[in-house]
Protein backbone atom coordinates (compact mmCIF):
# COMPACT_ATOMS: atom_id res chain seq x y z
CA UNK A 1 0.00 0.00 0.00
CA UNK A 2 2.86 2.38 0.81
CA UNK A 3 4.47 1.87 -2.62
CA UNK A 4 1.19 2.62 -4.36
CA UNK A 5 0.65 5.71 -2.25
CA UNK A 6 4.15 6.94 -3.00
CA UNK A 7 3.58 6.63 -6.75
CA UNK A 8 0.10 8.13 -6.62
CA UNK A 9 0.80 11.76 -7.33
CA UNK A 10 -0.88 13.72 -10.10
CA UNK A 11 1.45 14.63 -12.96
CA UNK A 12 4.47 12.79 -11.56
CA UNK A 13 5.12 10.77 -14.74
CA UNK A 14 5.75 13.65 -17.14
CA UNK A 15 4.55 13.40 -20.74
CA UNK A 16 2.79 10.59 -22.61
CA UNK A 17 2.84 10.62 -26.43
CA UNK A 18 -0.02 9.21 -28.51
CA UNK A 19 -0.17 8.82 -32.29
CA UNK A 20 -3.37 8.35 -34.34
CA UNK A 21 -2.65 7.95 -38.05
CA UNK A 22 -6.02 9.62 -38.70
CA UNK A 23 -5.65 13.14 -37.29
CA UNK A 24 -8.38 14.74 -35.13
CA UNK A 25 -10.26 17.65 -36.75
CA UNK A 26 -12.59 18.80 -33.94
CA UNK A 27 -13.03 18.00 -30.23
CA UNK A 28 -16.83 18.10 -30.09
CA UNK A 29 -18.36 14.61 -30.48
CA UNK A 30 -21.74 16.10 -31.37
CA UNK A 31 -20.28 17.59 -34.55
CA UNK A 32 -18.35 14.52 -35.75
CA UNK A 33 -18.77 10.78 -35.94
CA UNK A 34 -15.09 10.18 -36.69
CA UNK A 35 -13.47 7.82 -34.20
CA UNK A 36 -10.30 9.93 -34.12
CA UNK A 37 -12.34 12.99 -33.02
CA UNK A 38 -14.49 11.14 -30.47
CA UNK A 39 -11.49 9.47 -28.86
CA UNK A 40 -9.25 12.53 -28.63
CA UNK A 41 -12.18 14.47 -27.11
CA UNK A 42 -12.63 11.73 -24.49
CA UNK A 43 -9.51 12.93 -22.64
CA UNK A 44 -11.47 16.05 -21.61
CA UNK A 45 -15.19 15.31 -22.05
CA UNK A 46 -17.03 12.60 -20.12
CA UNK A 47 -20.47 10.94 -20.24
CA UNK A 48 -22.54 9.98 -17.17
CA UNK A 49 -21.55 6.32 -17.60
CA UNK A 50 -19.38 4.36 -19.97
CA UNK A 51 -18.52 0.86 -21.14
CA UNK A 52 -15.44 -0.89 -19.77
CA UNK A 53 -13.16 -3.17 -21.76
CA UNK A 54 -15.55 -6.12 -21.38
CA UNK A 55 -18.52 -4.11 -22.65
CA UNK A 56 -20.02 -3.76 -19.17
CA UNK A 57 -21.70 -0.44 -18.35
CA UNK A 58 -20.00 1.35 -15.43
CA UNK A 59 -20.92 4.64 -13.69
CA UNK A 60 -18.64 7.66 -14.24
CA UNK A 61 -20.24 10.96 -13.16
CA UNK A 62 -22.95 9.15 -11.15
CA UNK A 63 -22.72 6.77 -8.19
CA UNK A 64 -24.97 4.10 -9.66
CA UNK A 65 -26.57 3.12 -12.94
CA UNK A 66 -30.33 3.66 -12.99
CA UNK A 67 -32.26 0.38 -13.36
CA UNK A 68 -35.83 -0.79 -12.83
CA UNK A 69 -34.65 -2.67 -9.71
CA UNK A 70 -33.21 0.42 -7.98
CA UNK A 71 -36.06 2.70 -9.08
CA UNK A 72 -33.89 4.66 -11.52
CA UNK A 73 -35.93 3.40 -14.48
CA UNK A 74 -39.74 3.48 -14.22
CA UNK A 75 -41.68 0.20 -14.27
CA UNK A 76 -43.34 1.21 -17.54
CA UNK A 77 -39.88 1.93 -19.08
CA UNK A 78 -40.80 5.50 -20.06
CA UNK A 79 -38.50 7.34 -17.62
CA UNK A 80 -34.86 7.21 -16.48
CA UNK A 81 -33.49 9.25 -13.55
CA UNK A 82 -29.76 9.98 -13.27
CA UNK A 83 -28.31 11.31 -10.00
CA UNK A 84 -24.97 13.09 -10.38
CA UNK A 85 -22.18 12.36 -7.93
CA UNK A 86 -21.96 15.45 -5.67
CA UNK A 87 -18.86 17.63 -5.80
CA UNK A 88 -17.71 17.06 -9.39
CA UNK A 89 -16.13 20.17 -10.93
CA UNK A 90 -15.54 21.28 -14.49
CA UNK A 91 -11.88 21.89 -15.33
CA UNK A 92 -12.53 25.65 -14.86
CA UNK A 93 -13.51 24.99 -11.22
CA UNK A 94 -17.28 25.49 -11.56
CA UNK A 95 -19.68 22.71 -10.45
CA UNK A 96 -21.18 20.15 -12.84
CA UNK A 97 -24.99 20.30 -12.52
CA UNK A 98 -28.12 18.70 -13.97
CA UNK A 99 -28.57 21.87 -16.07
CA UNK A 100 -25.44 20.93 -18.05
CA UNK A 101 -26.90 17.48 -18.82
CA UNK A 102 -30.27 18.89 -19.93
CA UNK A 103 -28.48 21.55 -21.99
CA UNK A 104 -26.40 18.88 -23.78
CA UNK A 105 -29.54 16.98 -24.82
CA UNK A 106 -31.23 20.19 -25.99
CA UNK A 107 -28.05 21.12 -27.89
CA UNK A 108 -28.07 17.82 -29.80
CA UNK A 109 -31.85 17.72 -30.35
CA UNK A 110 -32.03 21.27 -31.73
CA UNK A 111 -33.70 20.99 -35.17
CA UNK A 112 -31.11 23.23 -36.86
CA UNK A 113 -28.09 21.75 -35.12
CA UNK A 114 -27.10 18.87 -37.41
CA UNK A 115 -26.05 16.75 -34.42
CA UNK A 116 -23.98 13.68 -35.34
CA UNK A 117 -25.39 11.75 -32.36
CA UNK A 118 -29.06 12.50 -33.03
CA UNK A 119 -30.21 8.83 -33.22
CA UNK A 120 -29.12 8.35 -29.60
CA UNK A 121 -31.70 10.92 -28.48
CA UNK A 122 -34.63 9.21 -30.19
CA UNK A 123 -37.97 9.04 -28.37
CA UNK A 124 -37.06 11.74 -25.80
CA UNK A 125 -40.28 13.55 -24.86
CA UNK A 126 -38.91 15.91 -22.18
CA UNK A 127 -36.08 16.38 -19.68
CA UNK A 128 -36.57 17.68 -16.15
CA UNK A 129 -34.03 18.88 -13.56
CA UNK A 130 -35.83 18.83 -10.17
CA UNK A 131 -32.56 19.77 -8.44
CA UNK A 132 -28.91 20.42 -9.27
CA UNK A 133 -27.95 16.72 -9.00
CA UNK A 134 -31.00 15.07 -10.63
CA UNK A 135 -31.85 14.59 -14.31
CA UNK A 136 -35.13 12.95 -15.35
CA UNK A 137 -35.44 11.91 -19.00
CA UNK A 138 -38.99 11.08 -20.18
CA UNK A 139 -39.53 8.96 -23.29
CA UNK A 140 -42.58 9.04 -25.55
CA UNK A 141 -42.87 5.23 -25.47
CA UNK A 142 -41.53 2.29 -23.40
CA UNK A 143 -37.75 2.14 -23.91
CA UNK A 144 -36.22 -1.10 -22.54
CA UNK A 145 -32.70 0.18 -23.34
CA UNK A 146 -32.69 3.79 -22.06
CA UNK A 147 -28.87 4.08 -22.05
CA UNK A 148 -28.32 5.25 -25.65
CA UNK A 149 -27.58 8.83 -24.56
CA UNK A 150 -24.93 9.93 -22.03
CA UNK A 151 -23.42 6.43 -21.89
CA UNK A 152 -20.12 6.16 -23.78
CA UNK A 153 -17.77 8.67 -25.37
CA UNK A 154 -20.08 9.52 -28.28
CA UNK A 155 -22.49 11.47 -26.01
CA UNK A 156 -20.51 13.23 -23.25
CA UNK A 157 -21.74 16.19 -21.18
CA UNK A 158 -20.97 19.68 -22.53
CA UNK A 159 -20.69 22.69 -20.21
CA UNK A 160 -23.75 24.93 -20.64
CA UNK A 161 -21.80 28.09 -19.76
CA UNK A 162 -19.32 27.39 -22.58
CA UNK A 163 -21.77 26.28 -25.28
CA UNK A 164 -25.01 28.19 -24.52
CA UNK A 165 -24.45 30.63 -27.40
CA UNK A 166 -23.50 27.79 -29.78
CA UNK A 167 -26.91 26.20 -30.29
CA UNK A 168 -28.60 25.23 -33.57
CA UNK A 169 -27.13 26.63 -36.76
CA UNK A 170 -24.41 28.41 -34.73
CA UNK A 171 -23.00 25.10 -33.41
CA UNK A 172 -20.26 24.60 -36.03
CA UNK A 173 -19.26 28.29 -35.89
CA UNK A 174 -18.12 28.14 -32.24
CA UNK A 175 -14.54 27.25 -33.09
CA UNK A 176 -13.07 28.21 -29.70
CA UNK A 177 -15.50 25.95 -27.81
CA UNK A 178 -15.37 23.10 -30.35
CA UNK A 179 -11.55 23.07 -30.30
CA UNK A 180 -11.09 23.65 -26.54
CA UNK A 181 -14.03 22.06 -24.71
CA UNK A 182 -14.16 22.46 -20.93
CA UNK A 183 -14.68 19.02 -19.43
CA UNK A 184 -14.68 16.91 -16.27
CA UNK A 185 -12.12 14.42 -17.62
CA UNK A 186 -8.51 13.87 -16.55
CA UNK A 187 -6.99 16.29 -19.09
CA UNK A 188 -7.53 19.83 -20.39
CA UNK A 189 -6.77 21.02 -23.94
CA UNK A 190 -3.92 23.54 -23.97
CA UNK A 191 -3.50 23.80 -27.76
CA UNK A 192 -5.32 22.24 -30.71
CA UNK A 193 -3.98 22.38 -34.25
CA UNK A 194 -6.66 20.66 -36.37
CA UNK A 195 -5.50 17.72 -38.48
CA UNK A 196 -2.10 17.87 -36.82
CA UNK A 197 -1.49 17.85 -33.07
CA UNK A 198 -3.21 18.44 -29.71
CA UNK A 199 -1.49 19.15 -26.40
CA UNK A 200 -3.26 18.46 -23.13
CA UNK A 201 -2.28 18.98 -19.50
CA UNK A 202 -3.60 17.34 -16.32
CA UNK A 203 -6.94 18.72 -15.09
CA UNK A 204 -6.15 20.25 -11.67
CA UNK A 205 -9.83 19.93 -10.70
CA UNK A 206 -10.12 16.22 -11.61
CA UNK A 207 -12.13 14.34 -8.98
CA UNK A 208 -9.37 11.83 -8.10
CA UNK A 209 -6.49 13.83 -6.57
CA UNK A 210 -3.91 11.12 -7.40
CA UNK A 211 -4.75 11.06 -11.12
CA UNK A 212 -3.80 11.41 -13.90
CA UNK A 213 -0.20 10.25 -13.43
CA UNK A 214 0.87 12.10 -16.57
CA UNK A 215 1.24 15.89 -16.47
CA UNK A 216 0.97 16.27 -20.25
CA UNK A 217 -0.30 14.46 -23.35
CA UNK A 218 1.05 15.02 -26.84
CA UNK A 219 -1.62 13.72 -29.23
CA UNK A 220 -0.18 13.55 -32.76
CA UNK A 221 -2.29 12.87 -35.84
CA UNK A 222 -1.50 11.80 -39.39
CA UNK A 223 0.75 9.43 -41.34
CA UNK A 224 -0.22 5.81 -41.87
CA UNK A 225 -0.63 2.66 -39.79
CA UNK A 226 2.85 1.38 -40.64
CA UNK A 227 4.60 4.58 -39.53
CA UNK A 228 2.50 4.74 -36.35
CA UNK A 229 3.33 1.14 -35.44
CA UNK A 230 7.04 1.75 -36.01
CA UNK A 231 6.99 4.94 -33.92
CA UNK A 232 5.91 2.92 -30.88
CA UNK A 233 7.40 -0.55 -31.39
CA UNK A 234 10.63 0.20 -33.29
CA UNK A 235 11.84 3.75 -32.55
CA UNK A 236 10.08 4.28 -29.21
CA UNK A 237 9.29 7.87 -30.20
CA UNK A 238 5.65 7.44 -29.11
CA UNK A 239 3.96 5.55 -26.28
CA UNK A 240 0.68 4.54 -27.92
CA UNK A 241 -0.44 3.92 -31.52
CA UNK A 242 -4.05 3.35 -32.55
CA UNK A 243 -5.76 0.93 -34.95
CA UNK A 244 -2.84 -0.83 -36.64
CA UNK A 245 -4.50 -2.48 -39.65
CA UNK A 246 -1.43 -4.48 -40.60
CA UNK A 247 -0.67 -8.13 -41.43
CA UNK A 248 0.33 -10.39 -38.49
CA UNK A 249 3.89 -10.84 -39.80
CA UNK A 250 4.41 -7.07 -40.15
CA UNK A 251 3.30 -6.49 -36.56
CA UNK A 252 5.47 -9.37 -35.33
CA UNK A 253 8.47 -7.82 -37.09
CA UNK A 254 7.87 -4.49 -35.35
CA UNK A 255 7.42 -6.16 -31.95
CA UNK A 256 10.77 -7.92 -32.42
CA UNK A 257 12.50 -4.54 -32.02
CA UNK A 258 11.62 -4.83 -28.33
CA UNK A 259 10.30 -1.32 -27.58
CA UNK A 260 6.58 -2.02 -27.48
CA UNK A 261 3.83 -4.56 -27.91
CA UNK A 262 0.64 -4.91 -29.91
CA UNK A 263 -2.64 -5.44 -28.06
CA UNK A 264 -5.89 -6.69 -29.57
CA UNK A 265 -9.39 -5.73 -28.50
CA UNK A 266 -12.41 -7.74 -29.53
CA UNK A 267 -15.80 -6.22 -30.26
CA UNK A 268 -18.56 -8.07 -32.15
CA UNK A 269 -16.80 -8.12 -35.56
CA UNK A 270 -17.11 -11.64 -36.97
CA UNK A 271 -16.05 -13.27 -40.25
CA UNK A 272 -18.65 -15.81 -41.34
CA UNK A 273 -19.99 -17.91 -44.21
CA UNK A 274 -23.63 -17.07 -44.86
CA UNK A 275 -25.79 -19.98 -46.05
CA UNK A 276 -28.41 -19.21 -48.68
CA UNK A 277 -31.74 -20.52 -47.34
CA UNK A 278 -33.32 -19.90 -50.77
CA UNK A 279 -32.56 -21.39 -54.19
CA UNK A 280 -30.02 -19.35 -56.22
CA UNK A 281 -30.33 -21.51 -59.36
CA UNK A 282 -29.71 -19.27 -62.43
CA UNK A 283 -32.45 -21.22 -64.26
CA UNK A 284 -35.02 -19.50 -62.03
CA UNK A 285 -36.39 -16.13 -63.14
CA UNK A 286 -35.44 -12.83 -61.43
CA UNK A 287 -38.53 -12.94 -59.19
CA UNK A 288 -37.71 -16.42 -57.90
CA UNK A 289 -33.91 -16.73 -57.88
CA UNK A 290 -32.61 -16.40 -54.31
CA UNK A 291 -36.21 -15.70 -53.28
CA UNK A 292 -38.06 -19.02 -53.12
CA UNK A 293 -37.38 -21.50 -50.31
CA UNK A 294 -35.93 -23.94 -49.59
CA UNK A 295 -32.41 -24.45 -50.91
CA UNK A 296 -32.18 -27.92 -52.51
CA UNK A 297 -29.58 -29.20 -50.02
CA UNK A 298 -28.27 -26.44 -47.72
CA UNK A 299 -31.55 -26.64 -45.81
CA UNK A 300 -30.52 -30.10 -44.55
CA UNK A 301 -28.88 -29.87 -41.09
CA UNK A 302 -26.54 -32.77 -41.93
CA UNK A 303 -25.11 -30.76 -44.83
CA UNK A 304 -24.44 -27.44 -43.12
CA UNK A 305 -23.27 -29.06 -39.87
CA UNK A 306 -20.84 -31.27 -41.80
CA UNK A 307 -19.57 -28.21 -43.71
CA UNK A 308 -18.87 -26.48 -40.40
CA UNK A 309 -17.23 -29.56 -38.88
CA UNK A 310 -14.81 -29.85 -41.82
CA UNK A 311 -13.31 -26.38 -41.18
CA UNK A 312 -10.05 -25.93 -39.24
CA UNK A 313 -10.79 -22.60 -37.58
CA UNK A 314 -7.55 -22.33 -35.53
CA UNK A 315 -5.60 -22.59 -38.80
CA UNK A 316 -7.74 -19.86 -40.39
CA UNK A 317 -7.04 -17.59 -37.40
CA UNK A 318 -3.30 -18.27 -37.60
CA UNK A 319 -3.09 -17.59 -41.34
CA UNK A 320 -5.44 -14.64 -41.58
CA UNK A 321 -5.41 -12.69 -38.35
CA UNK A 322 -2.78 -13.82 -35.86
CA UNK A 323 -3.45 -12.32 -32.46
CA UNK A 324 -6.23 -10.19 -33.99
CA UNK A 325 -8.42 -13.27 -34.41
CA UNK A 326 -10.08 -15.93 -32.26
CA UNK A 327 -12.11 -19.00 -33.09
CA UNK A 328 -15.84 -18.42 -32.67
CA UNK A 329 -18.98 -20.49 -33.20
CA UNK A 330 -21.33 -17.56 -32.55
CA UNK A 331 -23.03 -14.85 -34.58
CA UNK A 332 -22.74 -12.54 -31.52
CA UNK A 333 -19.26 -13.29 -30.11
CA UNK A 334 -19.19 -10.25 -27.82
CA UNK A 335 -19.81 -8.62 -25.37
CA UNK A 336 -19.06 -11.56 -23.09
CA UNK A 337 -22.54 -11.30 -21.55
CA UNK A 338 -24.09 -12.29 -24.89
CA UNK A 339 -21.48 -14.85 -26.04
CA UNK A 340 -23.27 -18.23 -26.06
CA UNK A 341 -21.40 -21.34 -24.88
CA UNK A 342 -23.71 -23.82 -26.62
CA UNK A 343 -21.38 -24.81 -29.47
CA UNK A 344 -17.77 -25.96 -29.70
CA UNK A 345 -16.22 -25.65 -33.15
CA UNK A 346 -12.53 -25.42 -32.30
CA UNK A 347 -11.59 -28.87 -33.66
CA UNK A 348 -11.73 -29.93 -37.29
CA UNK A 349 -13.30 -33.39 -37.79
CA UNK A 350 -13.33 -34.54 -41.42
CA UNK A 351 -14.16 -38.15 -40.46
CA UNK A 352 -17.06 -36.99 -38.28
CA UNK A 353 -18.36 -34.78 -41.09
CA UNK A 354 -18.25 -37.68 -43.56
CA UNK A 355 -20.08 -39.95 -41.10
CA UNK A 356 -22.76 -37.31 -40.54
CA UNK A 357 -23.47 -37.15 -44.28
CA UNK A 358 -23.35 -40.96 -44.66
CA UNK A 359 -25.80 -41.40 -41.78
CA UNK A 360 -28.17 -38.91 -43.43
CA UNK A 361 -28.10 -40.95 -46.65
CA UNK A 362 -26.38 -38.15 -48.57
CA UNK A 363 -23.87 -40.23 -50.51
CA UNK A 364 -21.98 -40.28 -53.79
CA UNK A 365 -24.07 -42.62 -55.96
CA UNK A 366 -22.26 -42.19 -59.29
CA UNK A 367 -18.62 -42.35 -58.14
CA UNK A 368 -17.60 -38.83 -59.24
CA UNK A 369 -16.50 -37.89 -55.71
CA UNK A 370 -19.46 -35.55 -55.16
CA UNK A 371 -22.33 -36.54 -52.88
CA UNK A 372 -25.95 -36.08 -53.92
CA UNK A 373 -29.09 -35.26 -51.95
CA UNK A 374 -32.31 -36.41 -53.62
CA UNK A 375 -30.40 -36.59 -56.91
CA UNK A 376 -28.95 -33.06 -56.63
CA UNK A 377 -25.11 -33.00 -56.50
CA UNK A 378 -23.59 -31.01 -53.60
CA UNK A 379 -21.93 -28.42 -55.86
CA UNK A 380 -21.77 -24.91 -54.44
CA UNK A 381 -20.84 -21.45 -55.67
CA UNK A 382 -18.81 -19.78 -52.89
CA UNK A 383 -18.40 -16.01 -53.25
CA UNK A 384 -16.69 -13.26 -51.24
CA UNK A 385 -14.99 -9.90 -51.75
CA UNK A 386 -11.55 -9.54 -53.31
CA UNK A 387 -9.06 -9.56 -50.43
CA UNK A 388 -5.89 -11.64 -49.95
CA UNK A 389 -6.97 -13.13 -46.61
CA UNK A 390 -10.41 -14.06 -47.97
CA UNK A 391 -8.95 -15.77 -51.03
CA UNK A 392 -6.64 -17.80 -48.74
CA UNK A 393 -9.68 -18.82 -46.69
CA UNK A 394 -11.61 -19.81 -49.82
CA UNK A 395 -8.79 -22.04 -51.08
CA UNK A 396 -8.47 -23.87 -47.75
CA UNK A 397 -12.20 -24.30 -47.22
CA UNK A 398 -12.70 -25.54 -50.81
CA UNK A 399 -10.08 -28.24 -50.11
CA UNK A 400 -11.67 -29.28 -46.80
CA UNK A 401 -15.14 -29.44 -48.32
CA UNK A 402 -13.83 -31.57 -51.21
CA UNK A 403 -12.67 -34.09 -48.58
CA UNK A 404 -16.31 -34.58 -47.51
CA UNK A 405 -17.73 -34.86 -51.04
CA UNK A 406 -18.77 -31.24 -51.59
CA UNK A 407 -17.47 -29.41 -54.65
CA UNK A 408 -16.97 -25.62 -54.58
CA UNK A 409 -16.60 -23.08 -57.34
CA UNK A 410 -14.81 -19.99 -56.00
CA UNK A 411 -15.66 -16.44 -56.97
CA UNK A 412 -14.37 -13.12 -55.66
CA UNK A 413 -15.98 -9.77 -56.38
CA UNK A 414 -14.60 -6.23 -56.10
CA UNK A 415 -15.48 -5.02 -52.59
CA UNK A 416 -17.05 -1.77 -53.77
CA UNK A 417 -19.46 -3.76 -55.96
CA UNK A 418 -20.03 -6.64 -53.51
CA UNK A 419 -20.87 -4.30 -50.62
CA UNK A 420 -22.27 -1.56 -52.86
CA UNK A 421 -25.95 -2.48 -52.66
CA UNK A 422 -26.80 -1.54 -56.28
CA UNK A 423 -30.17 -3.24 -56.91
CA UNK A 424 -29.27 -3.55 -60.60
CA UNK A 425 -26.09 -5.55 -59.96
CA UNK A 426 -26.14 -9.36 -59.78
CA UNK A 427 -22.95 -9.30 -57.69
CA UNK A 428 -24.02 -7.76 -54.37
CA UNK A 429 -23.92 -9.68 -51.12
CA UNK A 430 -27.59 -8.76 -50.58
CA UNK A 431 -28.71 -10.28 -53.89
CA UNK A 432 -26.77 -13.43 -52.95
CA UNK A 433 -26.72 -15.15 -56.35
CA UNK A 434 -24.58 -17.94 -54.85
CA UNK A 435 -24.98 -20.82 -52.41
CA UNK A 436 -22.65 -19.45 -49.74
CA UNK A 437 -20.83 -16.15 -49.26
CA UNK A 438 -18.23 -14.92 -46.80
CA UNK A 439 -17.81 -11.51 -45.17
CA UNK A 440 -17.69 -9.79 -41.78
CA UNK A 441 -20.28 -7.82 -39.89
CA UNK A 442 -20.53 -6.09 -36.51
CA UNK A 443 -22.71 -3.67 -34.54
CA UNK A 444 -22.21 -0.51 -32.49
CA UNK A 445 -22.53 -0.32 -28.72
CA UNK A 446 -23.04 -3.39 -26.59
CA UNK A 447 -26.71 -4.24 -27.05
CA UNK A 448 -27.33 -6.71 -29.92
CA UNK A 449 -31.12 -6.33 -30.20
CA UNK A 450 -31.10 -4.48 -33.53
CA UNK A 451 -28.33 -6.72 -34.92
CA UNK A 452 -30.29 -9.87 -34.03
CA UNK A 453 -33.19 -8.30 -35.94
CA UNK A 454 -31.15 -9.07 -39.08
CA UNK A 455 -32.59 -12.61 -39.07
CA UNK A 456 -36.27 -11.62 -39.03
CA UNK A 457 -38.28 -13.10 -41.93
CA UNK A 458 -39.42 -9.77 -43.34
CA UNK A 459 -35.88 -8.34 -43.39
CA UNK A 460 -34.83 -10.64 -46.27
CA UNK A 461 -33.68 -8.80 -49.44
CA UNK A 462 -36.01 -9.49 -52.38
CA UNK A 463 -37.26 -7.74 -55.53
CA UNK A 464 -40.01 -5.80 -53.73
CA UNK A 465 -37.49 -4.33 -51.26
CA UNK A 466 -35.14 -3.30 -54.11
CA UNK A 467 -32.88 -6.08 -52.79
CA UNK A 468 -32.30 -4.16 -49.54
CA UNK A 469 -32.52 -5.81 -46.13
CA UNK A 470 -30.08 -7.21 -43.58
CA UNK A 471 -31.35 -10.81 -43.53
CA UNK A 472 -28.96 -11.86 -46.27
CA UNK A 473 -29.29 -15.61 -45.55
CA UNK A 474 -33.09 -15.38 -46.05
CA UNK A 475 -33.37 -17.20 -42.72
CA UNK A 476 -36.99 -17.46 -41.63
CA UNK A 477 -38.49 -18.87 -38.44
CA UNK A 478 -41.77 -17.84 -36.82
CA UNK A 479 -40.35 -19.00 -33.49
CA UNK A 480 -37.33 -16.72 -33.98
CA UNK A 481 -39.50 -13.73 -34.89
CA UNK A 482 -41.65 -14.23 -31.78
CA UNK A 483 -38.63 -14.56 -29.49
CA UNK A 484 -37.06 -11.41 -30.96
CA UNK A 485 -40.31 -9.54 -30.31
CA UNK A 486 -40.02 -10.68 -26.67
CA UNK A 487 -36.46 -9.26 -26.55
CA UNK A 488 -37.71 -5.82 -27.63
CA UNK A 489 -40.09 -5.78 -24.65
CA UNK A 490 -37.65 -7.08 -22.00
CA UNK A 491 -35.81 -4.66 -19.71
CA UNK A 492 -33.94 -6.95 -17.28
CA UNK A 493 -30.35 -7.19 -18.55
CA UNK A 494 -29.82 -10.82 -17.49
CA UNK A 495 -33.05 -11.84 -19.17
CA UNK A 496 -32.05 -9.90 -22.32
CA UNK A 497 -28.76 -11.83 -22.38
CA UNK A 498 -30.58 -15.17 -22.04
CA UNK A 499 -32.95 -14.36 -24.93
CA UNK A 500 -30.14 -12.98 -27.13
CA UNK A 501 -28.09 -16.17 -26.68
CA UNK A 502 -31.15 -18.28 -27.55
CA UNK A 503 -31.64 -16.24 -30.75
CA UNK A 504 -27.94 -16.65 -31.64
CA UNK A 505 -28.21 -20.41 -31.11
CA UNK A 506 -31.33 -20.72 -33.29
CA UNK A 507 -29.63 -19.07 -36.28
CA UNK A 508 -26.54 -21.31 -36.00
CA UNK A 509 -28.49 -24.50 -35.23
CA UNK A 510 -31.02 -23.90 -38.03
CA UNK A 511 -28.49 -23.07 -40.76
CA UNK A 512 -28.37 -19.30 -41.11
CA UNK A 513 -24.58 -19.09 -41.12
CA UNK A 514 -21.27 -20.76 -40.27
CA UNK A 515 -19.22 -18.46 -37.98
CA UNK A 516 -15.46 -18.62 -38.54
CA UNK A 517 -13.34 -15.94 -36.83
CA UNK A 518 -13.99 -13.36 -34.12
CA UNK A 519 -11.90 -10.44 -35.39
CA UNK A 520 -10.15 -7.86 -33.25
CA UNK A 521 -8.71 -4.39 -33.46
CA UNK A 522 -4.99 -3.92 -32.85
CA UNK A 523 -3.14 -1.04 -31.22
CA UNK A 524 0.32 -0.86 -29.70
CA UNK A 525 1.86 0.60 -26.58
CA UNK A 526 5.36 1.08 -25.18
CA UNK A 527 6.56 -1.65 -22.83
CA UNK A 528 6.88 0.87 -19.99
CA UNK A 529 3.35 2.30 -20.37
CA UNK A 530 1.11 0.82 -17.67
CA UNK A 531 -2.66 0.88 -17.16
CA UNK A 532 -3.59 0.41 -20.82
CA UNK A 533 -6.86 -1.50 -21.31
CA UNK A 534 -7.87 -1.55 -24.97
CA UNK A 535 -11.58 -0.87 -25.34
CA UNK A 536 -13.66 -1.56 -28.46
CA UNK A 537 -17.01 -0.63 -26.88
CA UNK A 538 -16.18 2.97 -26.05
CA UNK A 539 -13.30 5.36 -26.52
CA UNK A 540 -10.28 3.10 -26.99
CA UNK A 541 -8.24 5.29 -24.64
CA UNK A 542 -11.05 5.47 -22.05
CA UNK A 543 -8.70 4.48 -19.17
CA UNK A 544 -6.07 7.21 -19.74
CA UNK A 545 -6.61 8.54 -16.19
CA UNK A 546 -5.03 5.25 -15.04
CA UNK A 547 -2.10 5.26 -17.47
CA UNK A 548 1.32 5.55 -15.83
CA UNK A 549 4.98 5.00 -16.50
CA UNK A 550 6.19 1.62 -15.24
CA UNK A 551 9.31 2.21 -13.15
CA UNK A 552 12.30 -0.06 -13.72
Regions found by a protein language model. Give the residues of each.
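N-terminal lobe/hinge region of extracytoplasmic solute-binding protein
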Residues: 19-73, 106, 182-184
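Mature extracytoplasmic/periplasmic domains
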Residues: 166, 324-342, 522-524
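Extracytoplasmic/periplasmic ligand-capture domains
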Residues: 4-10, 50-53, 65, 70-71, ...
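Surface-exposed binding/hinge segments that line
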Residues: 117-167, 191-193
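Active-site-proximal polar cores
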Residues: 516
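Short N-terminal segments immediately surrounding and downstream of signal-peptide cleavage
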Residues: 8-22
